[in-house]
From Swiss-Prot:
Coiled coil: none annotated. Residues 1-25 form a propeptide. GO terms for biological process: defense response to bacterium. The gene is AtxA2. It comes from Asticcacaulis excentricus (strain ATCC 15261 / DSM 4724 / KCTC 12464 / NCIMB 9791 / VKM B-1370 / CB 48). It is found in: Cytoplasm; Secreted. GO terms for cellular component: cytoplasm; extracellular region. This lasso peptide is hydrolyzed to a linear form by the isopeptidase AtxE2, in vitro. The isopeptidase AtxE2 only recognizes the threaded form (but not the unthreaded form). Shows weak antimicrobial activity against its phylogenetic relative Caulobacter crescentus. Does not show activity against other bacteria tested (E.coli, Vibrio sp, Burkhoderia thailandensis, and Salmonella newport). This is Astexin-2. InterPro entries: Lasso_benenodin.
Length: 49
């Protein structure tokens, strides 16, 4: 993760993976991390490819 991405992630409050995992309790930890990655991409306007 680039420094810029990390700063942007902190700004939108998604850097707390523990919080993200709690919010997606029905998913495995890996799926929760995938979900957070998708949120990062959406927030930063990157493609999902």
């Amino acid at each position: 993760m680039t420094k810029r991405t990390t700063i942007a992630a902190r700004r939108v409050g998604l850097i707390d993976l523990g919080k993200a995992t709690r919010q997606t309790k029905g998913l495995t930890q890996i799926q929760a991390l995938d979900s957070v990655s998708g949120q990062f991409r959406d927030q930063l306007g990157l493609s999902a490819d």
